[in-house]
UniProtKB/Swiss-Prot annotation:
Gene Ontology MF annotations: asparagine-tRNA ligase activity; ATP binding; nucleic acid binding
The organism's taxonomic lineage, starting at the top: Archaea, Methanobacteriati, Methanobacteriota, Thermococci, Thermococcales
Record protein name field: Asparagine--tRNA ligase
BP GO terms, sorted: asparaginyl-tRNA aminoacylation
Alphabetized Gene3D superfamilies for the sequence: Bira Bifunctional Protein, Domain 2, Nucleic acid-binding proteins
Catalyses which reaction(s): tRNA(Asn) + L-asparagine + ATP = L-asparaginyl-tRNA(Asn) + AMP + diphosphate + H(+)
Family matches, as PANTHER family: ASPARAGINE--TRNA LIGASE, MITOCHONDRIAL-RELATED, ASPARTYL/LYSYL-TRNA SYNTHETASE
GO cellular component: cytoplasm
Record family assignment: Belongs to the class-II aminoacyl-tRNA synthetase family.
Highest taxon of source: Archaea
Subcellular location: Cytoplasm
EC number(s) given by UniProt: 6.1.1.22
Gene (UniProt): asnS
Pfam families attached to this UniProt entry: tRNA-synt_2, tRNA_anti-codon
Keywords: Aminoacyl-tRNA synthetase, ATP-binding, Cytoplasm, Ligase, Nucleotide-binding, Protein biosynthesis
Amino acid sequence: MIEKTYCQDIKPELDGKRVKLAGWVYSNMRVGKKIFLWIRDSTGIIQTVIAKNVVGEDVFETAKKLGRESSVIVEGIVKADERAPGGAEVHVEKLKVIQAVSEFPIPENPEQASPELLLDYRHLHIRSPKVSAIMRVKETLIMAAREWLLREGWHEVFPPILVTGAVEGGATLFKLKYFDKVAYLSQSAQLYLEAAIFGLEKVWSLTPSFRAEKSRTRRHLTEFWHLELEAAWMDLWDIMKVEEELVSYMVQRTLELRKKEIEMFRDDLTTLKNTEPPFPRISYDEAIEILQSKGVKIEWGDDMGADEERVLTQEFDRPFFVYGYPKHIKAFYMKEDPNDPRKVLAADMLAPEGYGEIIGGSEREDNYDKLVQRIKEEGMDPKDYEWYLDLRKYGSVPHSGFGLGVERLVAWVLKLDHIRWATLFPRTPARIYP
């Protein structure tokens, strides 16, 4: 391993010290007999100065031709200079070129490129400081979730990705051949988490989920990261409390640790700071009334899509819940409302500022006969869910759970214009490369 000093550690206090930097050329500018070479590594960008009378003619000419993303190692002396970014720069004495790049396919300002070009060259685009910032924020949100879940006594489990049945509807399954059988890519770990609660009571997982939806909206991916929780002995109101406490902690902790990165995308942090529980709660009935009062053409019983949710979120300055959805627009495993058989005990958490649903949750149907009936109503075969139905035959208990779309949360926190920027290599109906 090359011993090096990271860019973030080059500070005025190191004035006069010799350092070695290893990284990539971010920008190259010649001014007379000096070259200002900005070098990027995983921690930031530092200005280096290459003077012809120090490094000699040959090295100077080599440096002059270095294009963006050329990989280099430089050695030199730190000089405190208030004009330099960060108050210090490195005056180069030695330059080693690992690989020279003449022309990088992505413009210096990626925002000048089309989304399609950035996605075609996503393997190169992810080097940019903004993409790195997105990934750091995503990483920190997940780290914060782990902290909270560990503190609150939840157990992480590791469910399968290859499954035999649908959780969210058969039309969105990715089908594949599994030796002499048929298998599918998991839409959700939920059914397996439900099995785990009978031993561990409070469980969670973080896995990729797959949906063969041809939706081309700004909030849909065919592959996304799914943070899912399931707990025995909890009803809908209990699990909603878990959701708001978890999301609040994730956002506040990430604000604490990644404020600089978040400010690259948001000028105003007020909305993110305003995530202390409890979150507002409105019924589906109230949501329909609000939308109708805003001129939206929607009737009771209709599902709310991205457009309707966007209008609804304008009424709130923080995440909020919509609960009590009609049974026919929700999944088979959700428990029927005992006070209104038209509805299920389900709630979605919506993010403000037009982002909409980030969590879907419900109390689960714990009665064997009712669950069989719901499976049949959805046109599915109970035999395909025999193992899942066993959970209702051997010590069934009230339980609830939810799933959080990680990329949707990242998109809201960073105010991204499309969910595809919240994942390393996005998968959509139109894109599986690179």
